[in-house]
Amino acid sequence: MGFFSEFKEFAMKGNVVDLAVGVIIGAAFGKIVSSFIEDVITPLLLKPALDAANLSTIEQLTAFGGVKYGLFLSAVINFIIVAFVLFLIIKAMNHAKKKDVAPPPPPAGPTQEELLTQIRDLLKNK
């Protein structure tokens, strides 16, 4: 088997394709969360604090002349939201998996032959 055919076989496996789709969706989701933080959360929740500090964005928060802790705070908020949403997605998937799994069948009772044998033995003992 040639190098390229092996690579093609590897690349077309379900797990690799699923992983690639997950990475692409994750990157797009990261952009959505970043926009949510910068365009919704920061203006709504942090607006009073930013106005008091005479700043327009959280990224402008600095300390000691150059430490940009505003960018760090933005990244932390971003991470917390992404982690929480992923937790909710995984929790929903696990809940759906539990519904899909059929309960184990009840233990099988005695077969017809075993019942007949028991009846025969009971009749013999009388």
UniProtKB/Swiss-Prot annotation:
One of its GO terms (molecular function) is mechanosensitive monoatomic ion channel activity. Pfam families: MscL. InterPro entries: Mechanosensitive_channel_CS, MS_channel, MSC/AndL, MscL_channel. Keywords: Cell inner membrane, Cell membrane, Ion channel, Ion transport, Membrane, Transmembrane, Transmembrane helix, Transport. Gene3D superfamilies: Large-conductance mechanosensitive channel, MscL, domain 1 (1.10.1200.120). It is found in: Cell inner membrane. It is a multi-pass membrane protein. Disulfide bonds: none annotated. Its main location: membrane. It comes from the Bacteria. GO terms for cellular component: plasma membrane. The chain crosses the membrane at residues 17-37, 70-90. Belongs to the MscL family. This is Large-conductance mechanosensitive channel. It comes from Flavobacterium johnsoniae (strain ATCC 17061 / DSM 2064 / JCM 8514 / BCRC 14874 / CCUG 350202 / NBRC 14942 / NCIMB 11054 / UW101).
